[in-house]
Amino acid sequence: MTESSIISVKQSSPVPEEEDHHHHQQDSHRTNTKKRVRSDPGYRGVRMRTWGKWVSEIREPRKKSRIWLGTFSTPEMAARAHDAAALTIKGTSAVLNFPELATYLPRPASSSPRDVQAAAAVAAAMDFSPSSSSLVVSDPTTVIAPAETQLSSSSYSTCTSSSLSPSSEEAASTAEELSEIVELPSLETSYDESLSEFVYVDSAYPPSSPWYINNCYSFYYHSDENGISMAEPFDSSNFGPLFP
């Protein structure tokens, strides 16, 4: 083997290593591309955050600003939020993620960002059941029928006030209970009407003159300079009225 052939063999030996490195870079690029495609839900106006949540936003017409619609746990929720906002801002020309749900999505009272966000939140909470003819919100007590319902602050206040106001049956039962309340006797009843009771007088407020209760046995109280003295019970029918 000549010297020139040995040099040519040494120069050609590193070529396979470079080719292997090049193939490895291509494989890693393909893997990264597959990961990016896997994380893309394919819904319009929906993006995935690095921590696993899904966000939705929509651009306002003829403006550079965007309306933030919220962060959601699934891409379908974010897609429904985008559809509700798109129908409000772009109308019938909007490109929807779920065109079959267009008649079920809520309609805000105006196209202001706050009303659009409220409608998007309601649309995201909807769960369409193929066996049912209505859209049910995640709250089982609320059902939205397939109609163009307008959402506004006044409608929310109306629902709240109606749920808190008592029904006519409850009001009638309350009136019946009030009518059955027994009227208590007057506190201004004279001493003569309480013939079978003893009357107690506080020593801190002595009477100005002796007195008695007619036609009953009672204690006789007398006030003098030395204080209050109490005599034995007596039969008031044997004595006439006492005057100061």
UniProtKB/Swiss-Prot annotation:
This is Ethylene-responsive transcription factor ERF037. The keyword Nucleus applies. Probably acts as a transcriptional activator. Binds to the GCC-box pathogenesis-related promoter element. May be involved in the regulation of gene expression by stress factors and by components of stress signal transduction pathways. PANTHER family: ETHYLENE-RESPONSIVE TRANSCRIPTION FACTOR ERF037, ETHYLENE-RESPONSIVE TRANSCRIPTION FACTOR ERF042-RELATED. It comes from Arabidopsis thaliana (Mouse-ear cress). PROSITE patterns: AP2_ERF. Belongs to the AP2/ERF transcription factor family. ERF subfamily. Residues 19-30 have a biased composition (Basic and acidic residues). Keywords: Activator, DNA-binding, Ethylene signaling pathway, Nucleus, Transcription, Transcription regulation. Residues 42-99 bind DNA. Residues 1-42, 154-177 are annotated as: Disordered. Residues 1-14 have a biased composition (Polar residues).
